[in-house]
Swiss-Prot record:
InterPro entries: Ribosomal_uS19, Ribosomal_uS19_bac-type, Ribosomal_uS19_CS, Ribosomal_uS19_SF. This is Small ribosomal subunit protein uS19m. Belongs to the universal ribosomal protein uS19 family. Keywords: Mitochondrion, Ribonucleoprotein, Ribosomal protein. GO terms for cellular component: mitochondrion; small ribosomal subunit. GO terms for molecular function: RNA binding; structural constituent of ribosome. It holds the Pfam family Ribosomal_S19. The lineage of its organism: Eukaryota, Viridiplantae, Streptophyta, Embryophyta, Marchantiophyta.
Amino acid sequence: MTRSIWKGPFVDTCLFKQKKIRWRIWSRRSCILPQFVGCYAQIYNGKGFVGLKITEEMVGHKFGEFASTRKTSSLGKRALPSKTKIKPIKKVR
């Protein structure tokens, strides 16, 4: 369900108080407004900060959409050896 239009976009009040060009943002739920275009933001993903330059295409989206909280899986790496070794079956005559 989307947010009601009469409420307007949610933006944390601390974002309006900052006057720097480079911001550190913990509020992933805040909407990106047109006045943020051209600024650099570092968005917290739960472990560290992810750098991002805000462009016009990002207006209306949330900050959290651009900082993934999950690790990417790497399918190309070799598998770990299993702990139990399979013993070969002896032939019976």
